[in-house]
Design a protein with these regions (language model features):
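Acidic/polar-rich alpha-helix caps and helix-coil junctions
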Residues: 1-48, 52-54, 58-197
């Protein structure tokens, strides 16, 4: 949760919220876009030959704490793991999230602060920022024992699951995903023809 001198500004979504249909964790969203047809657009990519599955063998490959609120946002079906963030649901809070495309999340503010501390070679405060966020998601904060950049990438992976933001963190941190992906050319975006001089 974020606080100011007058009290709370934001609180984190809970596991109960997810159960009630808050599949975008909207309490954590600071800014989002909207698309009224989002569920319709996503439908062809779920439970078909074109399914968008997560690159993991098991949910524990992604989440190191089974109580992690974000772990409820994935589903194991037919030996494949899917993000449920863009799937239709009839739960109570579904109408609030069905058209949301999160752009800035509260967690990102913690990542920015953690990166700042890391740039000042203050590993203790850098990991503390990640620990605060982990605690808000019901994760044990004491599991942050590895390299800061690796820990940050792991947290970003959990935070932005299925949203496309992880790509930019890999680029920014000059890291490769932990699975076989072929060439580094996948991280090089083509230059538009109108920018060739």
């Amino acid at each position: 949760e974020a606080k100011g001198s007058g009290g709370k500004f934001f609180t984190m979504s809970t596991s109960g919220d997810v159960t009630n249909g808050n599949i975008k964790l909207y309490d954590n969203v600071i800014f989002c876009l909207s698309n009224q047809n989002l569920w319709t657009i996503y439908e062809p990519y779920y439970n078909t030959d074109q399914s968008l599955v997560l690159a993991a063998w098991d949910i524990t490959d992604i989440f190191d704490a089974i109580n992690d609120t974000r772990a409820q946002l994935v589903k194991l079906e037919n030996s494949q793991i899917y993000s449920i963030k863009n799937l239709p649901t009839q739960a109570k809070l579904a109408s609030y999230v069905k058209d949301m495309i999160p752009m800035i999340r509260l967690g990102e503010m913690y990542y920015i602060r953690a990166e700042y501390y890391n740039s000042k070679e203050d590993d203790t405060n850098a990991k503390n920022e990640l620990a605060i966020l982990r605690s808000a998601y019901n994760c044990p904060p004491d599991k942050l024992t590895g390299d800061f950049v690796d820990e940050l990438i792991n947290e970003v992976h959990r935070e932005y699951l299925g949203e496309g933001q992880l790509f930019y963190y890999y680029k920014k941190m000059n890291k490769r995903p932990g699975y076989a992906m072929g060439s580094d050319d996948l991280f090089v975006l083509p230059r538009p023809d109108n920018e060739n001089l």
